[in-house]
Amino acid sequence: MTKTLKDHFSIIRSREEVITEIYNTADLLYVYEGWTEEQQTLFLDYCTGMRGIKILYDQFFKLILSPEQYPERLESILSAILNEPVKILQVLPNESTRIAAEKSLLVLDIVVELNDRSIANVEVQRIGYAFPGQRSACYSADLLMRQYKRVKKSKRKNFRYSDIKKVYTIVFIEKSASDFHKFPHTYIHRSKQQTDTGLQIDLLQEYIFISLDIFKNNLQNKGISKDNELEAWLTFLSVDDPKWILKLIETHPKFKKLYLEIYEACRNTEVFMGLFSKELLELDQNTVDFMIDEMQDTIDAQKVEIDSQAKQIAEQQLQLNEKDALIAQLQKQLAEK
């Protein structure tokens, strides 16, 4: 008999229990009936273990992986990604200069300072941006400049450029752009600047792009390695299929505690419904923003095409005018003969 999440987590309630509580509580029922049928089903699936929650979505991430409350968990993720032990000194205010079009695609965006004073920005994109390199470079430069201003203000006359530390931009992508799919077996791409001579100059900015959809495709083929900490975390962050959740807690038992916390939260229907509602509001607004951005991109592309066609027509008209002038000149010459 196939095991379910309820077999591992006895605190998971049945669908009937959750629905009964909702219909017996006026405030809960009011919120519940404000959702679409699809959203109601998703909420019940979360509460009853039929589907795992999306850990990387902002509200759920804060529930389980908040760097303020559980710094050791995000430290473990960053250590696995950066291939070195890290400690989080503090969570920095995210004074992001992102334009609204960029924010519409983000479901998580946090900035932390590590023990060596380097900065790590962790973001999750629902859909991979166009021009990911250019966008990430601009945001990384913004973080670097903010660090420079903060350190210079703090150190004053004792400031040295050696006080400026690395800025890591770590991007998780749920649905990768087509360029990433040219590498179907590679889901982590690391980038940093270097000279063409081998001269070692630390230019401070490093980028790591992690394609979660490509990771899951590879996971289907090779399974979860017992000895790979990074793969274990990526599985936890990306999968919502109970089958893979069960495989994860079998190969890496430490994740059972995290899932237990999730299902303990699910038992408080009022609190979990509040988290779910906030996430729906953010996703709905982000979807609207994204659709507007897409429409604007389409309009801009059409305008470019129309301008190009108008230019071609003008050039063709000019050529016709020149031909007409030439014909008129030849006709005049023939008439004079």
Language-model features: locations:
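Short conserved micro-motifs at the rims of enzyme active sites and ligand-binding pockets
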Residues: 181-183, 219-224, 274-275
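Short hinge/gating elements
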Residues: 57-65, 155, 216-220, 244-248, ...
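Short, charged alpha-helical interaction segments and adjacent helix-coil junctions
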Residues: 2-51, 120-125, 235-337
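Selected N-terminal structured segments and early membrane-anchoring regions
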Residues: 158, 214-215, 262, 267
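An acidic, glycine-/histidine-flanked metal-binding catalytic module
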Residues: 203, 207-256, 268
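Non-catalytic, well-ordered alpha-helical scaffold segments
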Residues: 58, 72-75, 134, 164-167, ...
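Short, solvent-exposed polar/charged micro-motifs at secondary-structure junctions
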Residues: 97-104, 219-221, 257-258
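Accessory alpha/beta interaction modules
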Residues: 1-206
